[in-house]
Structures are given as C-alpha cells and as structure tokens.
Swiss-Prot record:
UniProt GO BP: tRNA modification
Presence of the UniProt keyword tRNA processing in the record: yes
Family: Belongs to the IPP transferase family.
GO molecular function terms attached to this record: ATP binding; tRNA dimethylallyltransferase activity
Protein name: tRNA dimethylallyltransferase
Enzyme Commission number(s) from the entry: 2.5.1.75
Sequence segments annotated as region (Interaction with substrate tRNA): 45-48, 168-172, 284-291
Subunit structure: Monomer.
Cofactor field: Mg(2+)
Binding locations of substrate: T22, A23, S24, G25, K26, S27
C-alpha cells in the first residue's frame, strides 16, 4: 500500500467516486476507506435524499452517519422532487466546503444519471409545470404510442432514445417543448450547465463478473429488508398527504412494487418477486452504463475482500497524485 498524502489530493482538487450496481458493496468500501482517510461522503443516490425511506433504500445507519459525515441524505420529503441539475449545484457547494475542511469528498452511489450530470453537465431547462405534465400524462395513459408519435414530430432525436413505455422521460421531453417551443435536444445542445469541471473525479467501479452472485445478493438483501420492516415503513410513507404513484420517491425500486401491493394489484409473493426482478434489472442498467465509462479503476466485489479493495483504492489515489 502506497503512502497517501491527502493534502496533495485536495491541492489537485481530486474527488473520489465509488460507483457500482445496487448490492455491490459501495457503502462497505466507503466506510472502510474512512479508517484510512479523512473523508466526507456525498450520496449519489436519488432515493437516499428522502426522509423516512430508510430500510427500502439501504440507507446508511445513524451510527454510520455519525461516524463519517454524510451529505444529500434525508434532505427532502417523499412528496418533493429533486433533479440532476439540483444535484450538480449541491455537489459544487459541498465539494468546496469539504476541501476547505481539509477532507476528501467521496461521491458514492449508483444513480448513474447523477454521475453523468457531474461529468457531462446538464442543460438549463425550465422547472416542471404540473398542469402541463398532468395533461400529457393523462394522454400517455390513454395511448402511449400516440404521445410518442407526438414527440417524434417535434423532437425526432429525443423520440429515438426515449421509449414509449418510459413515461417520465417522454412526458418531460414534451413538457419542455410545450413550455419553450424548442425541442429538448436543441436546448441540451445550446446551453450546458457546467458539471464538476473545476474538480477531478478519480473513479472506482465495483463490477462483479459473476452476475449470478450479484442476483443472489440482491435477493438476500431484499428479504433482509422485509425482515427489518420494509412493508411497515412503506405503508407509513404512503400515508403522507400529497403522495401519488407518479412521484420520483414512489417510482424507486421496491417502493413502486409495495405501492401496487397495498393497492391490491399484487399479492405478497408477486410483490416480492417483482421487487427482486426490478432490482436486478436496475443492476443490469447500472453495469451497462459503467462498462461505457473510461478512466476508472474496476474492482470485482466478489473476487476480493474489502481490505484488498481499500488497498487498491489507496494505491490508485496515490498514483494519481504522483502522475498529476
């Protein structure tokens, strides 16, 4: 293990990113790194931002949050929305503050859209208009293909990459067009909000070669969540005023299926099966995204132990400071 000079990392404005699919051991690695480095953790997870959603999101425990400073956890109620642009803005401020305290920012999580926004930037788009959104959503519920055809007329590039069964992105693209008179694709080209350009991301990805082991781990973890009271937690969240199935919090994996269970659209066994399948599908999308990433240290969480992974990360960071 090479010696680590944290001051050099701070001077060179290097942030550490711990990326990986769900249930790959990101939190365990990050907490283990805290024994070797003065770190503060910035959550890169679109579900951990919500208060009261703890068990179903595998949120760090209170003890873990006390032991190591965590950010962007429990910042909103489930009835509120939070965009990738909001995330980029918050991370900019947090990274500056963490460096000023003499600590290393560690961005850890699996929301790849957030990581992409940090690296590529985000177009400055108008805030959501609930009336327009509701109108388009109603049309989509009646005929998804017709709404997709409408998008194809005004923004063929967006229609090419957005499936008709992806209501969130489909509705947003049409909403932006109605509000601005310009295609979403054009707006994204015209004005990019800066990503994390003033800082460098040292990227570490936990990618298991053995997909079967990851699938087993996902199933084990979900059953642990159930034993820890996930359904009771979900029922409490769903009792909040102003909650609907269209909100981002309720679209989170596990909560979406629990919502349908409480709506009596799923029986218990179907709820469990659908939740595990949806989590595995999420992991597949995360791995697909990670395999396209460049300049990253790849570690297999099932072929190494956590001490080996910590050593590999420390050596990687040390080499970066020497090569800069």
């Amino acid at each position: 293990m090479q010696s680590m000079n944290v001051a050099q990392l701070i001077e060179q404005k290097i942030c550490l990113a711990i990326m990986g699919p769900t249930a790959s051991g990101k939190s365990g690695l990050t907490m283990a790194l805290a024994k070797h480095l003065p770190i503060e953790i910035i959550s890169v997870d679109s579900a951990l931002i919500y208060r009261g959603m703890d068990i179903g999101t595998a949120k760090p425990t209170l003890d873990e949050q006390v032991a190591v400073p965590h950010h962007l956890i429990d910042i909103l109620d489930p009835t509120e929305s939070y965009s990738a642009a909001d995330f980029v803005e918050d991370v900019h401020e947090l990274v500056k503050e963490i460096f000023a305290r003499g600590n290393l920012p560690v961005l850890a999580g699996g929301t790849m859209m957030y990581f992409n926004a940090l690296q590529q930037g985000m177009a400055k788009l108008p805030s959501a208009d609930e009336a327009i959104r509701a109108k388009i959503h109603q049309a989509w519920q009646a005929n998804p293909a017709a709404v997709h055809a409408q998008l194809k007329q005004v923004d063929p590039e967006a229609a090419e990459r957005i499936h008709q069964n992806d209501p969130q992105r489909l509705i947003r693209a049409l909403e932006v067009y109605e509000m601005t008179g310009k295609p979403l694709t054009q707006l994204q080209r015209e004005g990019q909000q800066e990503g994390l350009t003033e800082f460098k991301l040292a990227k570490v990805a936990l990618i298991p070669e053995d997909r079967k082991k990851l699938h087993e781990q996902i199933a084990v973890r979900f059953h642990e969540m159930l034993n820890n009271g996930f359904l009771k937690e979900a029922e409490k969240v769903f009792s909040l005023d102003g909650l609907s199935a269209d909100l981002p919090a309720i679209r989170s994996v596990g909560y979406r299926q629990a919502w349908l269970f409480f709506a009596q659209e799923y029986d218990y066994d179907t709820f469990v099966e659908k939740s595990i399948v949806a989590t595995r599908q999420l992991a597949k999308r995360q791995i697909t995204w990670l395999r396209k990433e460049q300049d990253l240290l790849v570690l297999d969480p099932f072929k190494t132990n956590v001490d080996d992974r910590v050593e590999a990360v420390l050596d990687y960071l040390s080499a970066l400071t020497k090569n800069a």
